[in-house]
Amino acid sequence: MRLLSILTTVFLVGCGGGGSSAPEETPTPAPAPTTQNCNVFVTKGPYPQIWPTVEWNTASLESQGMCPDEVQSVIDYAFLEGNDTGAIIVIRNGYIVIEEYDSGKTENDLATSWSVGKSFASALMGVALEEGLVSSLDETTGQYFPEWAGTERENITIRNLMTLRTGLQADCLGPPNDFDNGGNSIYFSLDQVACALNRELQGPIGEKLYSYSNSDVMLAGEIMEITSGMKLDEYLDQKLGSIMNADYQWWEDAFGNSLGYCCIDATPRDFGRFGLLFARNGEWDGQQLIPQSWIELSTSLALNGEYGYYWWPINGHDGFVAIGLHGQTIAVIPEDNLVIMRFGNYSRLGDGSTVRVGTNGHSTSQPLSYDITSFINRVTALIR
């Protein structure tokens, strides 16, 4: 009975004695736990890895290892007046942790890729190689393009197209020695494959005369259509989109040529599925949709600070980013299981079936003060 006696005594003392009329004090609540340099408690990993199904899962920033203290500054930066941002989404560990839309926009509204589409073309090339539709990156392209037969151009390889080392003029409609504009004039050509083929060598094959050429990518896309027997959007849907529950619409020119270098329309959430696929090394919920070896090769130049295989480097981060005109962004930082996206307000002109026929086309605008690296840095600064 000694233990009971001690406990009873302690209880009475703690209550101010057996018959005391002293008022009880209301206990002060313990402060909510916080994390260093954050006003709330941030959960530390490891984090469960989930996959979106038809719908996405959302989670708080702090539950996924990110501090929400400065999240409003991230949103304010993206949507600063004059930036004409339509949507931003941040995905961590498979959860959407930030999602904001411009006034009047919802998760169901389309965004457009512009040159973010190049990274989709790169992914499909990896699939085509895995399936044996393309035997090697070192295949010469003359077998696909009879227009080049009997000329030195027939020795250009698929790898040359993928790394922008064809030696051809960059712009199919501009001056032959203009290597600075990325060949943007091809967008205004009715038959864009013919335009891309109608370029002459300006230097040795394998020499990097420029860092960017829409025409080179257009031809890489054409090779995938020839070898697969499908339009790019059909091949994309069969190999990636339908499996990931994503709907991608790839634009064509007036001659029915898919624009491999640009112009995919999808919701921002569906673009996020593509980013997550690369954050997870080409795996989607147990299926290896893109060979891991291709993920490693196609992002290797970007991880070493050079544009190649249609991915850009991210300054200061061990990741890679797909970039499109007017600040379209899908940034992937695999070590943080992080996807960061920004899309501009998008108007789809005409009936959306082709580009530059009648009133059909794209409409986005140049943001006044949006910088891709600054935006990425603001998001990654939330990680604890």
Task: Indicate residue ranges for each PLM-predicted region.
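Sec-dependent bacterial lipoprotein signal peptides
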Residues: 1-13
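N-terminal leader/targeting segments and the immediately adjacent pre-domain N-terminus
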Residues: 16-106, 129-135, 163, 190, ...
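Structured C-terminal helix/loop/strand segments within mature extracytoplasmic catalytic/sensor domains
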Residues: 34-36, 324-384
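Active-site SXXK
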Residues: 94, 111-137, 161, 220-224, ...
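Catalytic-site signature segments of enzymes, centered on catalytic residues
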Residues: 101, 107-108, 173-262
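Active-site helix/loop module of the DD-peptidase/beta-lactamase fold
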Residues: 131-169, 201, 228-266
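Active-site-proximal alpha-helical segments within enzyme catalytic domains
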Residues: 216-223, 262-283, 328-345
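Active-site Gly/Thr loop motif
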Residues: 248, 292-341
